[in-house]
From Swiss-Prot:
This is Mevalonate kinase. It comes from Aeropyrum pernix (strain ATCC 700893 / DSM 11879 / JCM 9820 / NBRC 100138 / K1). Its main location: cytoplasm. Its EC number is 2.7.1.36. Catalyzes the phosphorylation of (R)-mevalonate (MVA) to (R)-mevalonate 5-phosphate (MVAP). Functions in the mevalonate (MVA) pathway leading to isopentenyl diphosphate (IPP), a key precursor for the biosynthesis of isoprenoid compounds such as archaeal membrane lipids. GO terms for biological process: isopentenyl diphosphate biosynthetic process, mevalonate pathway. The gene is mvk. Belongs to the GHMP kinase family. Mevalonate kinase subfamily. It comes from the Archaea. The active site is at D154 (proton acceptor).
Length: 324
C-alpha cells in the first residue's frame, strides 16, 4: 500500500432534465472545467476530513470505537469507505484533504465529485484504483447518504466527463456538441440548500398533482430529446428556447425561487438565448446560454444578484489520478 494518493473529478451543469431524471426522463449534462481534488493520506487515528469549505471533521473508523455521533459531513465518506471495504479494500486510519474549485451545495456536482475523487484516491492508495464502473457504484453509496434518491446523473458525469445524454438505468450516451460561437454563463444565487430537501419537495408536488404531473414529466422528456438534437446540430437558438421551456416545467413543480427567477430574467434581458436553474434549484446556480459577443453583458447583468458568476468550459476528462 502507498502512503498517499490523489485524484480529482469535475463539477457539472445539467443543461436540461434535472428532477425529471429522478423518475426516468432524459437529462443532458456537461462536465465543467472546475474540479475537486481529494488527497488521501494513511496514518493518524480514525478518519479526519480537512476542507477549507467544509471545515475539519473526524470520526472513528467504521466498526471501531463506540458508536459516536458522526458529523453529517463525514457520513457520505464513511458510506463510501464501507462500500470499498465490502470490495476487499482494507480499512486503515487516514486523512482526507479536499480542495475544491466547485462551490458546495450550489448545484454544480460538488458532492458527487468528492465521493468519486475520494473513492478513486483511496483505492489508488491501496495500489488498485477502481474501474469506472466500480467507481460509479462505490461513489453512489455516498451520494445516497448526501442526496437521498440520486438518479446517478451527477456521479456518472463526475466519473466520465464530457457531455452526456443520461437516462436512469440505461448506459449514458456521449454527445458530440456541434455548437459554435456560444458560451454558457453560470451565476450562483449564493443561496445554499440541500439537494435531498428540494428533490423530496418536487416529488411531493408531482404526487399531489397526480395524473397531470405525468404530462409534465413527458414534456420534460421530449424537451430533453429536442435539446440533444439542437446540441448535436449546433442550433443554439433552439437550445435556448428549450432551456426556457425547461425552466417553466421546473418552476411548475416548485424547484425555482425568487433568487433564481431574478437571475433568469436578468440573463434573458441581457440577451441570453435561454436561461434556467441548474441542479436541484431553490438556490444554487442559474445557467444562461449567450452568443459569445454578448456574454460580457450577461456577466454585468448578474453582478448585483449573484455571489459569483463565471463562464463554463466543457471538461472532456472525468475522474483521474493526480501526481503530487
Ligand atoms: C441534482 O444535480 C440533480 C437532481 O435531478 C437530483 C438527481 O438527479 O439525483 C435534482
Amino acid at each position: 500500500m502507498r502512503r498517499a494518493a490523489r485524484a480529482s473529478a469535475p463539477g457539472k451543469v445539467i443543461i436540461v432534465g434535472e428532477h425529471f431524471v429522478v423518475r426516468g426522463s432524459l437529462a443532458i449534462v456537461a462536465a465543467i472545467g472546475r474540479r475537486l481534488r481529494v488527497t488521501v493520506r494513511s496514518g493518524g487515528k480514525g478518519i479526519v476530513l480537512e476542507s477549507s469549505m467544509l471545515g475539519r471533521h473526524s470520526a472513528p473508523l467504521p466498526g471501531q470505537g463506540a458508536a459516536a455521533k458522526v458529523s453529517p459531513v463525514l457520513e457520505p465518506y464513511i458510506a463510501v469507505l464501507r462500500s470499498l471495504a465490502a470490495r476487499g479494500y482494507s480499512v486503515v486510519p487516514h486523512t482526507i484533504l479536499v480542495e475544491s474549485g466547485i462551490p458546495p451545495r450550489a448545484g454544480l456536482g460538488s458532492s458527487a465529485a468528492s465521493m468519486v475523487a475520494y473513492a478513486l484516491s483511496y483505492s489508488a492508495m491501496h495500489g488498485d484504483p477502481l474501474s469506472a464502473e466500480d467507481l460509479y457504484s462505490v461513489a453512489m453509496e455516498g451520494e445516497k447518504i448526501a442526496h437521498g434518491k440520486p438518479s446517478g446523473v451527477d456521479v456518472t458525469i463526475a466519473v466520465r466527463g464530457g457531455v452526456l445524454a443520461y437516462r436512469r438505468g440505461e448506459n449514458p450516451v456521449d454527445i458530440r456538441p456541434g455548437l459554435t460561437g456560444v458560451t454558457l454563463l453560470v451565476a450562483d444565487t449564493g443561496v445554499e440548500r440541500r439537494t435531498r430537501d428540494v428533490v423530496e419537495h418536487v416529488l411531493s408536488i408531482a404526487d399531489a398533482l397526480g395524473e397531470a404531473s405525468t404530462y409534465i414529466y413527458r414534456a420534460a422528456d421530449l424537451i430533453a430529446r429536442e435539446a440533444l438534437h439542437a446540441i448535436e446540430k449546433g442550433d443554439a437558438e433552439r437550445l435556448g428556447l428549450i432551456m426556457n421551456a425547461a425552466q417553466g416545467l421546473l418552476s411548475s413543480l416548485g424547484a425555482s425561487s425568487l433568487e433564481i427567477e431574478t437571475l433568469v430574467y436578468r440573463m434573458r434581458s441581457a440577451g441570453a438565448l435561454g436561461a434556467k436553474l441548474t441542479g436541484a434549484g431553490w438556490g444554487g446556480c442559474v445557467i444562461g446560454l449567450f452568443k459569445e459577443g454578448e456574454v460580457e453583458r450577461g456577466l454585468e447583468s448578474v453582478v448585483e444578484s449573484s455571489s459569483q458568476a463565471f463562464t463554463a468550459s466543457i471538461a472532456e476528462e472525468g475522474a483521474r489520478l493526480e501526481e503530487f
